[in-house]
Every structure is written in C-alpha cells, then in structure tokens.
C-alpha cells in the first residue's frame, strides 16, 4: 500500500469516528464567533441572538420562519384595542420552565414572568436591570420601548395587558424580536 492510500484510509477512519452520534443530552452549538452572553435582552450581536434567543428563549409572539409575519409564541392569542393603545395577550397554559441540576421550577410560566421580563429592561430600579455592571438594553431603547410602554399589567395568571402611551404600528413586530425574549 502506498502512502497516499494509507493516508486516505486513516482520514476516512477518523471521519467515521467523528460521525458517531453525541449523547442525547449533549447540546452542541457551532458559531462563527462567541456570543456576548446568553441573555439576549442587553446585547446586540447576531451571534448572541443565534446562540441564545432562538434556541433557548421564547417570546409572546414570534416571526413565522423566513418571514416578518407575526405568529403566536407564548401568547396563544391577543386583542388590540381600537385606539391601538392596549394589547391584551392570552398566554399558553402549561408552559414549563427548563430544569437542570441547579434549578427546579416550582410553577408554570405566567403573567408575572412577562411583567418581570419587560420591567427589568425598562425600570432602572428593578434589581435585575443592571445585573451585569454597565449593561444596556440598546435595542429596547432604540425601539423607544421605555417611552412607548406606559404599563404592563396582570389581568389574571394567564393574561397580560400592555398599555401604550401612543399607537405604534410595529409594536407586534418589536416584541417578536430576540431582545423581547
């Protein structure tokens, strides 16, 4: 056997060994760069959104794959008031939090979680607003969410209402963005 044939056989054997399936509980993610973090809200890099917002988090509404059409996410339905100032979302029931060795969820996802998610970005007094020193919420601020959202209110455990200061045509698209995770 010549050297070229041996090299090809060795390379083939290595390639076959690499094709062995990874254990079922192992998550393998390849990216062109390192994400800034795994919380998409305070960051702006596509690598962060690709590594966290899309595979890990859900939003009230999401974009239908390959489009800018909004479809249900954590909210199964919603109503918009005639004046465009109130958006009422009806949350899916039975949504479970992920669990792992250090976190065991004690309840299902509910309206309080939606309120927390938006409050931590828009309310500087929220203890989780700057849980990493110096972080900002550039997309949230650029979409003028702090001045747009008057309040996020719990109607009941599975219903949340956003009250806006003014009508905002792209509001539904804005909350489908990765930063709204």
Labelled PLM ranges:
Residues 55, 65, 69, 73, ...:
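Extracytoplasmic/secreted proteins, especially bacterial periplasmic and envelope-associated proteins
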Residues 1-9:
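Bacterial N-terminal signal peptides that target proteins for export
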Residues 32-35, 43, 65-66, 83-85, ...:
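Solvent-exposed coil/turn segments that connect beta secondary-structure elements
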Residues 76-128, 161:
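Aromatic- and charge-enriched surface segment that lines or borders ligand/interaction sites
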Residues 122-181:
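Surface-exposed binding/hinge segments that line
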Residues 19-24:
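Sec/Tat signal peptide C-region and signal peptidase I cleavage site
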Residues 30-82, 119, 126:
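N-terminal lobe/hinge region of extracytoplasmic solute-binding protein
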Residues 10-17:
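Bacterial N-terminal signal peptides
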């Amino acid at each position: 056997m010549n050297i070229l044939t041996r090299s090809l056989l060795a390379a083939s054997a290595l390639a076959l060994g690499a094709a062995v399936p990874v254990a079922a509980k192992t998550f393998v993610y390849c990216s062109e760069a390192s994400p800034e973090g795994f919380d998409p809200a305070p960051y702006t890099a596509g690598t962060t959104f690709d590594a966290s917002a899309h595979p890990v988090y859900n939003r009230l509404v999401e974009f239908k794959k390959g489009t800018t059409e909004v479809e249900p996410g954590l909210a199964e339905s919603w109503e918009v008031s005639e004046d465009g100032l109130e958006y009422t979302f009806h949350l899916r029931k039975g949504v479970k939090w992920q669990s792992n060795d250090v976190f065991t969820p004690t309840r299902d996802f509910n309206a309080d979680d939606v309120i927390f998610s938006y409050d931590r970005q828009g309310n500087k007094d929220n203890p989780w607003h700057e849980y990493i020193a110096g972080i900002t919420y550039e997309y949230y601020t650029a979409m003028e969410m702090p001045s747009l959202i008057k309040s996020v209110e719990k109607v009941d455990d599975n219903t949340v209402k956003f009250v806006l200061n003014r009508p905002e045509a792209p509001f539904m698209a804005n909350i489908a963005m990765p930063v709204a995770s």
